[in-house]
UniProtKB/Swiss-Prot annotation:
Pfam families: PSS (PF03034). Catalyzes a base-exchange reaction in which the polar head group of phosphatidylethanolamine (PE) or phosphatidylcholine (PC) is replaced by L-serine. The chain crosses the membrane at residues 38-58, 77-97, 103-123, 195-215, 222-242, 294-314, 319-339, 359-379, 390-410. Belongs to the CDP-alcohol phosphatidyltransferase class-I family. Disulfide bonds: none annotated. InterPro entries: PSS. The gene is PSS2. It comes from Oryza sativa subsp. japonica (Rice). One of its GO terms (cellular component) is endoplasmic reticulum membrane. It comes from the Eukaryota. It catalyses: a CDP-1,2-diacyl-sn-glycerol + L-serine = a 1,2-diacyl-sn-glycero-3-phospho-L-serine + CMP + H(+). One of its GO terms (molecular function) is CDP-diacylglycerol-serine O-phosphatidyltransferase activity. It is a multi-pass membrane protein. This is CDP-diacylglycerol--serine O-phosphatidyltransferase 2.
Length: 423
């Protein structure tokens, strides 16, 4: 009986949260209800005042002088700020409501700005695009040496006077080690499926092997690729991420409003818990449910690996060093975009009703991935002189043919089963 009451309470709480996210601010706690009421006119007036102050619209003539280049930069940033403010207030809400629906509307606006910036970059030539990056970070626009991790694969280097295990030491303390662990933790929290995570982990190592003739950065030693990447960094990130998933999956989501917390400490904990999920969905991908679902899940994996490959090719083509903040900003933005994208795509797959279109974030993610790929292809002309090895062409051609035959056989088998049931 108590379990049924808890279930009804949780279901009612979820309905209340969804209704409030759709604009029912009166359903929220009295202390925080004002955060969910529309403040469009107030923000418009405050924004107008900020524009007056920043632009000097009411200043006397000649009171504030800026060069043409500075004025253009200020104008572009103001244009982006106005657009993001509009998106935060007016963009469509997503299925995510924590910490606030406006946060995900802002992420939606950032994704659109990034897509538009990529479209602009696509219409430049390679040299102009590299020099354009100086406007984002002054140190860019300079050709960089690309590090090769496979130049010396010895585990023990006896002639090195400082460290006999210098190769292992430099690999372990490379910035990509931390990036691998954090990246796979983030993927595990988003995807929540161990099988897909290992497919992505091994698949990306195959991508590095495939494109090592193009990017020196992908030329890794066998122990770096198999032991350090897959069995240590990726495994630890997936392990930590799946433990995080199980932690949130085991919690009971019965939220009590801030005003109903009996103590100051309770109010602080409730405020901090606003940055945790309102409820936890078990994403069931079922890749072997049928040929169509297999292709849909495989498509998700292909997009994931393409986005990761774009990171390295964009750095190479645009001369962006690995430690430049722009690399980190892009990865953070992609992570923020991917969170609602995965939720939308999984809801699209699990919806039993015939859904005609995917969510806005799914569309934006695919569009950004395509434009990034087009930039890599356009700016990569003439940079990669070594042809793909013949054995790689044969290998991937065989994989493609085997995949097509497998899907056709699977589809034919399902068709025969359906025909037998009809008889």
């Amino acid at each position: 009986m108590e379990a049924k009451q808890r279930t009804r309470h949780r279901d009612g709480e979820e309905r209340r949260l969804v209704a409030a996210a759709d604009g029912g601010a009166e359903e929220y706690d009295p202390w925080t209800a004002w955060l969910y009421k529309p403040h469009t006119i107030s923000v418009l007036l405050v924004g107008a005042c900020l524009l007056i102050w920043a632009s000097g619209a009411l200043d006397p003539e000649g009171a504030s002088y800026h060069s043409s280049a500075t004025s253009i930069k200020r104008g572009v940033w103001a244009m982006i700020a106005v657009f993001l403010a509009y998106c935060t207030l007016q963009a469509p809400s997503t299925i995510l409501i924590r910490p606030h629906p406006a946060v995900w509307r802002l992420v939606h606006g950032l994704a659109v700005v990034y897509l538009v910036a990529l479209a602009f970059l696509l219409f430049q030539n390679r040299d102009d695009a590299r020099q354009f990056m100086k406007h984002l970070y002054p140190d860019l626009g300079v050709e960089l040496p690309e590090r090769s991790y496979g130049a010396d694969c010895r585990l023990y280097v006896p002639e090195n006077p400082k460290n006999k295990f210098i190769n292992i030491y430099e690999t372990l303390f490379d910035e990509f080690v931390v990036a691998h662990i954090l990246g796979w933790w983030g993927k595990a929290v988003m995807i929540r499926n161990q099988l897909l995570l290992w497919v992505l982990s091994i698949g990306f190592e195959l991508m590095e092997l495939t494109f090592r003739h193009m990017l020196p950065n992908f030329n890794e030693c066998w122990w770096d690729s198999i032991i350090l990447d897959i069995l240590i960094c990726n495994w630890f990130g997936i392990w930590a991420g799946m433990h995080t998933v199980r932690y949130f999956d085991g919690k009971t989501y019965e939220w009590v409003g801030l005003s109903r917390q009996p103590s100051i400490m309770g109010k602080v904990k409730r405020s901090l818990s606003q940055f945790t999920p309102a409820q936890w969905d078990k994403d069931q991908w079922y890749p072997f449910m049928g040929p169509l679902r297999f292709v849909q899940v495989l498509f998700l994996c292909v997009v994931f690996m393409t986005v990761e490959l774009n990171t390295f090719f964009l750095k190479f083509c645009l001369w962006i060093p690995p430690r430049n903040p722009l690399v980190v900003y892009r990865l953070i933005l992609w992570w923020l975009i991917a969170i609602p994208t995965i939720r939308e795509y999984n809801s699209y797959l699990q919806n039993s009703k015939p859904v005609k279109k995917v969510g806005a974030f799914c569309w934006l993610s695919l569009a950004i991935c395509i434009v990034e790929l087009l930039i890599c292809m356009k700016f990569g002309h003439g940079l990669f002189h070594d042809p793909m090895p013949t054995w790689l062409i044969i290998f991937w051609s065989s994989v493609g043919v085997a995949l097509v035959v497998f899907l056709l056989a699977w589809s034919w088998r399902n068709h025969l089963k359906y025909q037998r049931k009809r008889l």
